[in-house]
Amino acid sequence: ISRCLGDVVRVMGDPEKMITRVGMCSGSGSDEWPAAAALGAEAFLTGEAKHHHALEASAAGVVLMEAGHHATEAPGIFALADALQNWQDIVQCNVRVTKSVVRAYGISVR
């Protein structure tokens, strides 16, 4: 996941657990982990996780992964930009798409 999204992934819960189904909510979506677990997800990927959500998920046996707000939203935004550009030819309207990357936090300090 880290290689695909280009960001560090923090894992809360059992890092050795065998995972067959993952739920996901981009951005700050850690409050959605119970809905994913109810659908059979053994792990949940989000951009930002609240501390108590991580504790609750871990206690329920769900591995919670935090991969960065921007990193989890960018793939969807870029796909939407491409789709809008393609729809321009079908709908006959003027669509201008601008792709940019702005990160709220530039560096991590230890």
Language model feature labels by segment:
Residues 1-110:
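Hydrophobic structural segments
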